[in-house]
Amino acid sequence: MDFKYTEEKETIKINNIMIHKYTVLYTSNCIMDIYSEEEKITCFSNRLVFLERGVNISVRMQKQILSEKPYVAFRLNGDMLRHLKDALMIIYGMSKIDTNACRSMSRKIMTTEVNKTLLDELKNINSHDNSAFISSLIYLISKLENNEKIIESIYISSVSFFSDKVRNLIEKDLSRKWTLGIIADAFNASEITIRKRLESENTNFNQILMQLRMSKAALLLLENSYQISQISNMIGISSASYFIRIFNKHYGVTPKQFFTYFKGG
């Protein structure tokens, strides 16, 4: 079903969003179209959206209340994701899932209705209490129909690749002037070897660096604690004006448009 958007000022379209961490979104205040690999998934308000790590999406969303944030996001770091995966494998009696199988976008991005009581429990848990958060998420997943796809996606998201090691290295200091040579030295390998290993995973050094910089910039903008020039320096771009152009080219919106839409009240 297609959703008909109303006033343009209520909507935003953002391109090239790389999901670096397994993410669960709750569309508390928006209707969202998610585009990936020439497919579109429409998610209405008050739904959960499960986003597999590694997918690249574009989104178009419309707020219902302009002064509030459009959604609530739960992002799982590597340790949380592995613990969640291990627990689910035991609970549901699974040992291994084929990570090489051809999978459609509907198996990587899933939407579902959710019991508000369960969701409130998840939202109210202390963000630093990983065990309680994972336990609540497991319980929530157990109450969802057809949760096999979600469990499969969590398992696949937990698999680590060489490109993840490169990302982890760069993320330690995004302000550094990274080059392929620096990466090669860190892994005690040649630049050609690094390039080929990344190509085998359908990516490259420049793509990884740009995605990490833009993702970090977006998160820093949402924190509302830094000026544009500070954010630019924090992600390794010395010119604020150049950063604004790159951000706009990457996401299709300026940093100001991005911040204004997502900041909420």
UniProtKB/Swiss-Prot annotation:
Pfam family for this entry, one: HTH_18
Phenotypic consequence of gene deletion: No longer expresses CS1 or CS2.
Subcellular location: Cytoplasm
Domain (HTH araC/xylS-type): residue spans on this chain: 164-261
Keyword Acyltransferase: no
Matches recorded under InterPro entries: Homeodomain-like_sf, HTH_AraC, HTH_AraC-typ_CS, Tscrpt_reg_AraC-type_HTH
Domain of life: Bacteria
SUPFAM superfamilies per UniProt: Homeodomain-like (SSF46689)
Residue range(s) of DNA binding per entry: 181-202, 228-251
Protein name: DNA-binding dual transcriptional regulator Rns
This protein's encoding gene: rns
